[in-house]
Amino acid sequence: MDGAPVAEFRPTMTHGGRYLLYDIFGNKFEVTNKYQPPIMPIGRGAYGIVCSVMNFETREMVAIKKIANAFNNDMDAKRTLREIKLLRHLDHENIIGIRDVIPPPIPQAFNDVYIATELMDTDLHHIIRSNQELSEEHCQYFLYQILRGLKYIHSANVIHRDLKPSNLLLNANCDLKICDFGLARPSSESDMMTEYVVTRWYRAPELLLNSTDYSAAIDVWSVGCIFMELINRQPLFPGRDHMHQMRLITEVIGTPTDDELGFIRNEDARKYMRHLPQYPRRTFASMFPRVQPAALDLIERMLTFNPLQRITVEEALDHPYLERLHDIADEPICLEPFSFDFEQKALNEDQMKQLIFNEAIEMNPNIRY
């Protein structure tokens, strides 16, 4: 896909020249006419396709994600709206910036949603899988930026819930930006996520135990897993299923004591944990002898079984391992908590369309119909 000749994708003008329609390998890709060729497909997922293209008004290259048939499934539509609203609210160097929600040519008659964000070069998943050399300084700098972005997210009263290497985007200067907020939740909410959940390998023990009152600490666990994967170039806990995942965790950090199980209110979950084989705690120093002790100390504090005892993002930024990079004056917080109120109402397809259309119009006040 990456090597496709640029000349292949010539647009057709539509809607009186206000829009350009590209055919990307049989996929219809229709955007406002400020997005001029050359256009390049750079990725695809279950939702649709992503292309890089230049906005000729701002002279900035952007990544445009097409979410095809965005309203076929209520949950997916809500996820799209949540992502748009969150990205518009969160303004931070380590969070991907939203540039546009492209207004549809005909206000009520649209099924696809196009979201433009900053264009990045790659993601952490690709870097980990590549044979590119990564010094410990690189890993440390990536960890610092993840925590810096997460401090801002958590201060907005938001839990990301789906941190994993492929959701951490990078450019050639090693700048890191967190993306994919479709699963984010308010940090005060206590009902168990009913839909998708964090990719299993990065999932905190309390989520594996179906704890209903999880907190921002679940993101910290994910960061610990990601950092060790960066250093080791392979996943720390690559579980095949829920039970295998928990076994891998306890084999490393030890079977939790009754004291460590204190946060679990569900008696069945406690019983389940008590019946697991008894594993002693292994020291990270014995498993990763080449990693400096300060790094391992921080990771052990992140990978603490009990979320109430797990280190917070602010505490992690203040840890001696990050002393070289830490600067509290340059680690901003979000001054206004994000409101998830729009999720409280049951919305039908037309209402959901209207809300996403409203977001597009707010970002394109000069559009005329």
Curated annotation (Swiss-Prot):
Extent of motif TXY: 194-196
Expression triggers: By benzothiadiazole (BTH), dichloroisonicotinic acid, probenazole, jasmonic acid, wounding and infection with P.syringae and M.grisea, by stresses, hormones, heavy metals, high/low temperature, UV-C and phosphatase inhibitors.
Activity-regulation annotation: Activated by threonine and tyrosine phosphorylation. Activated in response to low temperature (12 degrees Celsius) treatment. Activated by phosphorylation at Thr-14 and Thr-32 by CPK18.
Enzyme class name: transferase
Residues bearing the modification Phosphotyrosine: Y196
Entry keyword set: ATP-binding, Cytoplasm, Kinase, Nucleotide-binding, Nucleus, Phosphoprotein, Plant defense, Serine/threonine-protein kinase, Transferase
Domain Protein kinase: 36-322
Active site: D162
Localization in the cell: Nucleus; Cytoplasm
BP term (GO), one: positive regulation of response to salt stress
Record keyword Transmembrane helix present: no
Post-translational modification: Dually phosphorylated at Thr-194 and Tyr-196, which activates the enzyme. Autophosphorylated. Phosphorylated by CPK18 at Thr-14 and Thr-32, which activates the enzyme.
Reported function: Involved in disease resistance and abiotic stress tolerance signaling pathways. Acts as a positive regulator of drought, salt and cold tolerance. Negatively modulates pathogenesis-related (PR) gene expression and broad-spectrum disease resistance. Functions downstream of CPK18 in a signaling pathway that represses defense gene expression and negatively regulates resistance to rice blast fungus. Phosphorylated by CPK18 at Thr-14 and Thr-32 and activated independently of MAP kinase kinase (MKK) phosphorylation.
Entry similarity comment: Belongs to the protein kinase superfamily. CMGC Ser/Thr protein kinase family. MAP kinase subfamily.
Record remark on domains: The TXY motif contains the threonine and tyrosine residues whose phosphorylation activates the MAP kinases.
Designated name of the protein: Mitogen-activated protein kinase 5
Gene: MPK5
